[in-house]
Amino acid sequence: MSFDIAKYPTLALVDSTQELRLLPKESLPKLCDELRRYLLDSVSRSSGHFASGLGTVELTVALHYVYNTPFDQLIWDVGHQAYPHKILTGRRDKIGTIRQKGGLHPFPWRGESEYDVLSVGHSSTSISAGIGIAVAAEKEGKNRRTVCVIGDGAITAGMAFEAMNHAGDIRPDMLVVLNDNEMSISENVGALNNHLAQLLSGKLYSSLREGGKKVFSGVPPIKELLKRTEEHIKGMVVPGTLFEELGFNYIGPVDGHDVLGLITTLKNMRDLKGPQFLHIMTKKGRGYEPAEKDPITFHAVPKFDPSSGCLPKSSGGLPSYSKIFGDWLCETAAKDNKLMAITPAMREGSGMVEFSRKFPDRYFDVAIAEQHAVTFAAGLAIGGYKPIVAIYSTFLQRAYDQVLHDVAIQKLPVLFAIDRAGIVGADGQTHQGAFDLSYLRCIPEMVIMTPSDENECRQMLYTGYHYNDGPSAVRYPRGNAVGVELTPLEKLPIGKGIVKRRGEKLAILNFGTLMPEAAKVAESLNATLVDMRFVKPLDEALILEMAASHEALVTVEENAIMGGAGSGVNEVLMAHRKPVPVLNIGLPDFFIPQGTQEEMRAELGLDATGMEAKIKAWLA
């Protein structure tokens, strides 16, 4: 869409942060109003992350107004909230392309803008990176300031606290802003607290505090008295004891929607030495009532009509794989009170809403804490329960040592329900489920299953749940199932594939939900088609049978080729000295960018047309 200057006259004056800093302060509330309306107008037309950005408009304006970005370095955690940042940093007219193939990246991205200091997508990385950036800035001696913005969800992760603990030790000059949008601003976060925050961040208070510490540093009783007095005074009005104990100077909480108040506080804090912590309270979805009332639903939105206040409803077609998992989870829990389900803050995305309501005492949302989720599951298994960890492929990467050390070595029966495996679409490089087969396949005695449809997915979940000799994993994609009939649950024979079609010279060994595309290719080329089902243990007998009865083999998977299921087939053939040609089809050796799943599969040659073209070129 073209930018309407008449509709957004103040925003039209801001093509860069340099122009933003030329505006009089009195015009900034109007700028915030226009920025919020422009965000609503843009995202409702194009889709994207929505409610978080509405809540950070004033903070974004204030930070870029006070700090000399991009010289001063502003780091956004995760990046859902960074749409206003993109709009103010030269990308205003392209915001309608966000999350689309070839468009703006969904998160801050170093290759896109000098204002994007850190490429992000996963949570809780900002403070660690910020410490490194602040230390580097100090060593180069250019008085470059560092600011990290982190949300109340991301700060729950252990990595954030590890970083703050380190910052308290080495004391770099940096500011951490906690964007706390868990609740609306209450009365005690009003004028009095804002005044106190400005006072506590001001030069008089800082000078008295630091001066007093220096003067009485050699007099232990007085020094301790000063410290206790300061703690008592601040403790009466400031809920920041934890952050103070970690070594930060805590200011807040303050109203995150008072742009002028934020500017005053940020200016006061800008030149303070050591690690500073500013706690702001915001409303997720601010300025758009439907998003304020239901920020979870409006977190990420498709195209919608903002005047209706409603998101378009599902067409009522086939269920998603997440829904298939959620239904199986409820069905199994109703029969077995030993079932325990765990998610690291992905209840809705993983299809666990119904389970959480029906079985609240067996549902555990551990927040953004993937490492803890896995070891917590290990403890439940040791205690005689049957834990299921529902987790996205890309987030399981964050708990790899726990899978190895805490689950697999001890042969604990933990089932990993791995959602969003393969190409996920619009969230791009940071969220593609490209590597789980590669990083799990090397774990001794782990069972790994790849269903080709929703019925097989249910059977594999059932099989993994009843597998007691160690961990198991079922990986399934983002998106809808294919519409096959659901049959009664039964355990599959471990490590056994099935032949779906008999052909002649070529055999296609398929792993996972690319099966419908592989079936089209098999029909076109008169090839044998095998549903391998298990990546580990592989059906070696079936692989050797296919090698003996065909001139060439093709493996198909939606995982990185390197180290994936196809690599496993190659290893089997080499171990048995079978010199049959093998073509491995899967994800190439680069990070897959954003685009719809259909667009990216077509581009990477993972649809039927692309697979057939690759096979014909290879056979030529």
From Swiss-Prot:
Q: Among its keywords, does the record have Transferase?
A: yes
Keywords, sorted A to Z: Isoprene biosynthesis, Magnesium, Metal-binding, Thiamine biosynthesis, Thiamine pyrophosphate, Transferase
Keyword Hydrolase among record annotations: no
Where on the tree of life does the source sit, at the highest rank? Bacteria
Q: Where does Mg(2+) bind?
A: D152, N181
Q: Which Gene3D superfamilies does this UniProt record tie to the protein?
A: 3.40.50.920, 3.40.50.970
Q: Which NCBIfam families match?
A: dxs, PRK05444.2-2
Write the protein's name: 1-deoxy-D-xylulose-5-phosphate synthase
Q: What organism does this protein naturally occur in?
A: Escherichia coli O6:H1 (strain CFT073 / ATCC 700928 / UPEC)
Q: Which gene encodes it?
A: dxs
